[in-house]
Amino acid sequence: MMTRMELRPLEIGFSKALTEVAPVTCQCECWDHNLCSSQASEMDLIYQSQDTHSCASKQDAVFQLLSETKIPVPNRYRKISHRLSTLSNKKTLKSQLDRFLSSSKKLHNDDVNRGDYCFLLSTPVECSASTNSHSYDCLWNFSCNSFPEYSSYSASETSSVASYSYYSGPNPATPSSSSCNLVNANSLDIYLNINNLKKSKSVPRLRGQFMEPVEHNHPLSKSLEEQSSFLEQSKDASSNLTACNRSGSSLSSNFYSSRLSKKTSLASLNKSRASLQHKIMSLSRNIIRRVFHKPEVHLDPSASILNLSSSHGESNLTNGLLCQNFKLFQDDWLMEDCAPDANFTLYTPLQPWEKRSVKPEIRRPRLNPNFFRVFVLEAQMRRAGKLSANTAGRAQLIYLPKPAVTFSTSPLHVEL
C-alpha cells in the first residue's frame, strides 16, 4: 500500500514502457544527454564530453528527452489520475523543448531560464571552427562568431556581474595574447585565452586570476586595501619599537609601545568605521530625499547650494546638503535630491520646529519594497551595532510620526 508521501509517476513519454524502449543515443558527440530513470521523482541530466564539437539535429534530443521522461503526480490525485491528459502534457513538454532548442538566445543553467519541468538546458550551436590539439570540455558553450578562426563565449547574468569572454585565437584588440587581458578599465569585459589551459577542468581554479583585476579596481575594495596597508604599517611600527626595547631595555619604552599598539588598534577601528560610513553613504545616495515646504524666498533652480537665513540671523540651514536638483511638485512642495556630507548629522533640528523658516515635513511611509528594504537593513545594522542609535536613518525618519503642533490658543476653545 502506498503511503501519502509517495509520488505516483505518470509516464508522458511514448506508448511503450521505459524498459521496452531502446536507449536512443544522441548523435551529438559533444552533448550526450543521459537521463537517469532509476527513480521516478529524480532526473539527473548527465553531460558527457568528447573531443569534437559536431552536434546533431534537434529532433534527436527532443526524442530522447521525451522517451525517458516521467512527471511525478502526487498520491492524493490518484482518484483523478485518469482525467489528466497524458497527450496534452506531452505536447506541452515537447513545445517547451522545441522553444528552448530553437531559440537563438543563449540559455544558461540558472533559475531564470528554467522551464516548468525543471529542465536546465544549454544547447550547443553547430560550429565548424578549426580546433587545436587541445581537448575542450563541453561545460563551456562555444558559439561561432563572425570570424571563422575565433570562437567566443560570453556569459552575463546581471548588469553588475562581470562578463567573461573566452577565445581560442589571438585577441584582435591586443597585439600580444596573454592568459588574462582586461580590455578596458571602465568595462568589466575580460578575455581568457583557452590555448594556455592544459585541461578544461582547471578553468574554475583560474577564476581568482582573472577576477583579481576586477576586484582590485572595484571602488568598494579600495577602502579595504587601504585599511590592510594601514594595519601592516602599524605592525611594522610596533615591531620596530620592540626591537628598540630589546637593544635598550627600559620600562618606559615598553609602556609607550603598548600605548602605541592601543592607538593603532583604535585608529584601525576609526578607519573601518569611516570606510563603513563611506559605503553606507554611497549605497544610500539614491534614496536620500528631503522635503521642504515652499518658502516665501524665491529659489533659483540653478543654484547648487541652498542658503536661507533663519529668524536668528543664521545662514546655511541646510549645511552639509549639496543639492543638485530641485523638483517642484503640486501643492507647493519642494523636494531635493541631495548627497549628504560625512561631517553633518542629517535631519537633526538645531532649533525648535516653530522657529525654523523652512520646516521639513515627515511624510507617511510609502508601501513600496524599497522603503521596507531600507527599513529592515537599518534595523539589522542598529541591532548589530553598525549604526548609532542617535542618528536617524532614512527609513526611521519616514516611519516616525510628525512632531506635535503647538497651538497659540487652546484647540478646545470655541468661538461663539
Swiss-Prot record:
Keywords: Cytoplasm. The keyword Cytoplasm applies. Disulfide bonds: none annotated. The keyword Transport does not apply. InterPro entries: PB1A10.08. One of its GO terms (cellular component) is cytosol. It is found in: Cytoplasm. Signal peptide: none annotated. May have a role in meiosis and sporulation. This is Meiotically up-regulated protein PB1A10.08. The lineage of its organism: Eukaryota, Fungi, Dikarya, Ascomycota, Taphrinomycotina.
